[in-house]
Amino acid sequence: MSRIDSDLQKALKKACSVEETAPKRKHVRACIVYTWDHQSSKAVFTTLKTLPLANDEVQLFKMLIVLHKIIQEGHPSALAEAIRDRDWIRSLGRVHSGGSSYSKLIREYVRYLVLKLDFHAHHRGFNNGTFEYEEYVSLVSVSDPDEGYETILDLMSLQDSLDEFSQIIFASIQSERRNTECKISALIPLIAESYGIYKFITSMLRAMHRQLNDAEGDAALQPLKERYELQHARLFEFYADCSSVKYLTTLVTIPKLPVDAPDVFLINDVDESKEIKFKKREPSVTPARTPARTPTPTPPVVAEPAISPRPVSQRTTSTPTGYLQTMPTGATTGMMIPTATGAANAIFPQATAQMQPDFWANQQAQFANEQNRLEQERVQQLQQQQAQQELFQQQLQKAQQDMMNMQLQQQNQHQNDLIALTNQYEKDQALLQQYDQRVQQLESEITTMDSTASKQLANKDEQLTALQDQLDVWERKYESLAKLYSQLRQEHLNLLPRFKKLQLKVNSAQESIQKKEQLEHKLKQKDLQMAELVKDRDRARLELERSINNAEADSAAATAAAETMTQDKMNPILDAILESGINTIQESVYNLDSPLSWSGPLTPPTFLLSLLESTSENATEFATSFNNLIVDGLAHGDQTEVIHCVSDFSTSMATLVTNSKAYAVTTLPQEQSDQILTLVKRCAREAQYFFEDLMSENLNQVGDEEKTDIVINANVDMQEKLQELSLAIEPLLNIQSVKSNKETNPHSELVATADKIVKSSEHLRVDVPKPLLSLALMIIDAVVALVKAAIQCQNEIATTTSIPLNQFYLKNSRWTEGLISAAKAVAGATNVLITTASKLITSEDNENTSPEQFIVASKEVAASTIQLVAASRVKTSIHSKAQDKLEHCSKDVTDACRSLGNHVMGMIEDDHSTSQQQQPLDFTSEHTLKTAEMEQQVEILKLEQSLSNARKRLGEIRRHAYYNQDDD
């Protein structure tokens, strides 16, 4: 590598450093001078390709700035070399595909450079990167005015692209207040290029107007004139924005345009002195001619001030880019005239041979007059623009002062509002403190009442008489105290586990007896305390409601004032819907973690897989509807579809969690059960994250494309978690030895189930005046109606599918197996209920049948009914009448089972109360009382231990029953 090439490489490295500063002018100038010295720019492009500048966004952006300046001010070979390397320049825009500010600027910069190179490749008359009017002299002999019209259109399109890119740069500068020097430096070549294009379009439109010079021609040029005026307004705003950047004004002098666009149709004597003639091209053979030797103009060396601000005296010798240079002198004009003459002779040799010698003198005079006219117009425009710029600066300062005053007023108003809200908050705190004191007083009164009641226990006979008198009064008040009783009952149920733990930790029987006596005293006194508690509660509730209403009124006023300042009303609604879905999933996860055992029917793995498919489809539909809402906008989008999808997705996920627990806990070993439940929790947690990612607080700060990406990524994560759960459940299908074929028709299975239930219940239609038997027959009738409704659902599915029903069942084999399993579960549970009722009829005095058997059988029927309804809901339509009827029949079965259970529990309580009345207790001595109490506690512990063992035994029986069912 030679020393010159080494210096070139060093200059490019320093110009494209990693610091976020503007490329230094001396390094860029070294590259430009290299192209003029060697009359070639191939080495510059080769060095740019070999240097690792594309790895860093800042270096790549600075490389594009350097490349743009080399194309503008370098040797014409730089433009030709850049046109050949358009594919390489286009590939630079795909290097960094991220969402950072520099990545977007790089893509837009590459897009603009490619458009510029395409323009130069199509219009070879522009032999340099700038758009000076003098450089287009070689195009004055274009054969067709249409080509000039097309050239103006292409230049205007390029000017629009330049304006769009400059707006993107300003937006990036405003978003990042620090380290904007590098981005500001990209505006320097854009200012020069935009002004060159503007000057050329102005001159070209005037020439076209002179050439056509009729009403029809002006009508044809009217669209170009309107677009020219629009571009003039945008260019004026662009230069005004550039003037507001102090750092940019130290680097380059901003052009000053008039407020109104110049009239390109205005013709004066100076304009008529120079016309661009458009002639029809005639095919002819070019005769041999003597090439005219024309002087080669010296390449322009455009000096630009350094990055650091310097005094004015030091910048007098340096000029900005081409648009700030003065117009060519008479000598320069004389140098360019032979070039135009040579170009004209090259294109029209026959016409040149016929021209008289004085034509060239007239042509030279016309060019000189045109140059003088353009110089005068430029000086006038600069003076007008200077005055307009000063007026604009004054208006800008006044607007800024008004804005500051308005901000101060708003700040004072906000401060006053904050003080008012603070005072209101202090008042509310004082009021709440008064309520706390009142509650403490009530608690002290309750303690006093407890002590008083303990003293009154001495006379039990008098107390029993008083309680008997008050019993009638409390019975009348029982209905009004039902809600309070349910709350106390819930508290009592919550205290039972703690009470059991405390019983195990009791060190002596005496302490347990004392605690029991205290509890009995409290229970006996609750009725006495209840009246005053209710009064105090009502009084406190009334005061609390009054304060809440006042607080709500204040908050409503504040909310109304805040809502008037915002237009986004849909975000809270969507957040509430998403939160409801999150709550549904959280409740299912809570039930999953609950230690209560599953008492419903056994769920087969095929049914779980069908639920997985339904959940996956609902998740995809939810993602699609949410993306559609983002694309259409909150105001014009379909919000109802999103709400339905959220409900369906959360409900299907909750159903999947519940049935997964049923299958894992009752069927699988502990290790596999924990594995399945862990995967189910991951799916539920992922669904919850899915909803949380779509909350407005997470989406307000991003654009629509990023929002759709978030939705798609969340859906992909959700599908991955569901796929993991599906892969974990599918091996369990191999464990089963399913006898029935997948082509089994669920429709025929449901019909067989209904016939079986009807035939089994025919021998029960006897006139037996037993309430249990009547309730059992009611459940059987409801189950028969349920199965018939399920058959109607299958018939409806057959009418909605375009393929035969058998093929539909074969295609959805997992759902088919789940539906068949649900039908068999209904038949089995109903058969157990019928068997229990038969034993009740055949046995004498119900020796072999207990009422508890009816409760168990009815619960099995209700659980299997729920499984059948859930399996049928998977493939039915949303507003299916048959499905609504099926769910109504399921509700009837559940109500009948609940009635049977309530009746049996009433019988048990009656028998228990009768047995207690038949065996009176002896409380004559304290020893007998304590002995009876200890015996009763021992009996309770035995029953609890028996209950625990029975539950464990029930789990083992269900697990073995599941595997035996699979073997069958």
Swiss-Prot record:
GO terms for molecular function: actin filament binding; clathrin adaptor activity; clathrin light chain binding; phosphatidylinositol-3,4-bisphosphate binding; phosphatidylinositol-3,5-bisphosphate binding. PROSITE patterns: ENTH, I_LWEQ. InterPro entries: ANTH_dom, ENTH, ENTH_VHS, I/LWEQ_dom_sf, ILWEQ_dom, Sla2_fam. The keyword Iron does not apply. Belongs to the SLA2 family. The gene is SLA2. The modification Phosphothreonine is found at T294, T298. The modification Phosphoserine is found at S308, S555. The chain crosses the membrane at residues 772-791. Required for cellular morphogenesis and polarization of the cortical cytoskeleton. It might act in concert with proteins such as CDC42 and CDC43 to limit the region of cortical patch formation to the cortex of the bud. Required for the accumulation and/or maintenance of plasma membrane H(+)-ATPase on the cell surface. Present with 40600 molecules/cell in log phase SD medium. One of its GO terms (cellular component) is cortical actin cytoskeleton. This is Protein SLA2. Keywords: Actin-binding, Cell membrane, Cytoplasm, Cytoskeleton, Membrane, Phosphoprotein, Transmembrane, Transmembrane helix. Residues 1-127 form the ENTH domain. It is found in: Cell membrane; Cytoplasm, Cytoskeleton, Actin patch; Cytoplasm, Cell cortex; Bud tip. Residues 717-965 form the I/LWEQ domain. Residues 280-324 are annotated as: Disordered. The keyword Transmembrane applies. It comes from Saccharomyces cerevisiae (strain ATCC 204508 / S288c). Residues 311-324 have a biased composition (Polar residues). It is a single-pass membrane protein.
